[in-house]
Amino acid sequence: MFHIEYDLRQDKHLTDTPLHFSIRKKEVNAMTCDEALYRQYLSGDDEGLNALMKKYGDPLTLYIDGYLHDVHEAEELMLDVFAYLFTKKPRIRDGGFKAYLYKAARHMALRHKSKRKPLFSLDALTGEPDGRLLAEEVIRTEERNRILHFCMSEMNPDYREVLYLTYFEDMSYAQAAEVTGKTVKQITNMVYRGKESLRRLLEREGITNAES
């Protein structure tokens, strides 16, 4: 579904190289585009919201699934998030659409999770990993990504969330702090600890070149 790089040797949030500024420029352009599409919807053109759903539908579902561990419920909740935008049409500050979207999704996921009856889940068991993940094919990108997803599922949920937001959703530490309700300092600390935890898990699965 998604192509994810697991090389943690470079932290885009802590570098001042020209590439860093190029990335930041792209982030600003992306945020501007999001706000333009949302304003397009507010002005009466549904294509704006359709474009936002197409852009964020899958990654938002994956984020929610990290809380619910049920992709079908996650898809329904993703639609609920956009339904909220349909009906309430909240005012969102410039540059804040993505953070607002994920913050709303997080709130709905936690509320939904608190209302569910406890269910026995095989995810809670510590079983032997699929042997295919430990075979020689691990050098192939598809296998590395599969191992990454497995290791992410084994992590502390708080660390997993901040790594997902900052690396896979390309959020700044400030945006991740807004989504999770934490401070930038806390996010910085959690990213560091999360990378160390992920590196150890990857090494356990035979990947030794994922340095933090």
Regions found by a protein language model. Give the residues of each.
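Short, charged helix-capping/linker segments at alpha-helix termini
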Residues: 42-51, 61-80, 184, 206-209
